[in-house]
């Protein structure tokens, strides 16, 4: 027997290897390399939003109250976009607009760009986190692929759309009522609901909800257990040793209901992935089109005939008039920097006004 005495053959770890060991260590909350992007960005985005909705006014940018301090509640508080005059400035705290003055920076709308940019990179970090963990446990990266849908929508609505317009001012502010205002704006100024990309997005999201409900109900329906004591609530027993979900029974059921049914789990679950993600991506593509002021369907022949014949009206022509009403009422309120003044006689008035 030979005994070798000497130095270990292991090389001392470099900085990268040491960081890799620490970041990817198995712990209660995984950090990973993606965490270097995710955690700081998520912290700053959420912290900026909480700060803005609690303390910061939108008086200087929109002429509005937008914080709890001013009397707003959770539904009406918001971190609002910068003024239109600031165009696409990044509004850095140390930039020429705020010049390091935190109060002035908040008044100018600097928190909005802060939250939007950190939020976007935080979402990207979360997608990378799913990819990194999938690699670590040898899964395929479909979770990360699925999460690209919400990221595409966020980036298109909050970043690309205002970049195509005159400034960040026309992006949505971060708040519940503020998002509703933005939806009304999209309809009135872009006829968004008649846009085929919006239609595909609605089909994707509502179709995904339908698929999710059908799938959950079908799995619950086809859980079975051998023995005499089986009942509905035994299906929730976590101590059952093995899977007792019957794909064959589910296939027979839906074949009788619809005449067609998924024949294997892979195709079924891929379809459940494909429908919502494709819908979200189509919506994002549509918003990029709106950033460039591309129009939705225009049925000009109906508009001309409606203008010539007072008795001719379609749901399309009614919607066009409603959009004109949204624009007339909204523009003066929504864009105070334009100093728009419309005579009373041109404003549409309903019976309740």
From Swiss-Prot:
Its Enzyme Commission number? 1.10.3.9
For the ligand (chlorophyll a ChlzD2), the binding residues are 118
Q: Where in the cell is it found?
A: Plastid, Chloroplast thylakoid membrane
Q: Where are the transmembrane segments?
A: 41-61, 125-141, 153-166, 208-228, 279-295
Identify which top EC class this enzyme belongs to.
oxidoreductase
- Residues annotated as carrying Phosphothreonine in the record are 2
State the family it belongs to: Belongs to the reaction center PufL/M/PsbA/D family.
Instruction: Say what the protein does.
Output: Photosystem II (PSII) is a light-driven water:plastoquinone oxidoreductase that uses light energy to abstract electrons from H(2)O, generating O(2) and a proton gradient subsequently used for ATP formation. It consists of a core antenna complex that captures photons, and an electron transfer chain that converts photonic excitation into a charge separation. The D1/D2 (PsbA/PsbD) reaction center heterodimer binds P680, the primary electron donor of PSII as well as several subsequent electron acceptors. D2 is needed for assembly of a stable PSII complex.
Subunit relationships: PSII is composed of 1 copy each of membrane proteins PsbA, PsbB, PsbC, PsbD, PsbE, PsbF, PsbH, PsbI, PsbJ, PsbK, PsbL, PsbM, PsbT, PsbX, PsbY, PsbZ, Psb30/Ycf12, at least 3 peripheral proteins of the oxygen-evolving complex and a large number of cofactors. It forms dimeric complexes.
What else does UniProt say about it?
Answer: 2 of the reaction center chlorophylls (ChlD1 and ChlD2) are entirely coordinated by water.
- What is the protein's given name? Photosystem II D2 protein
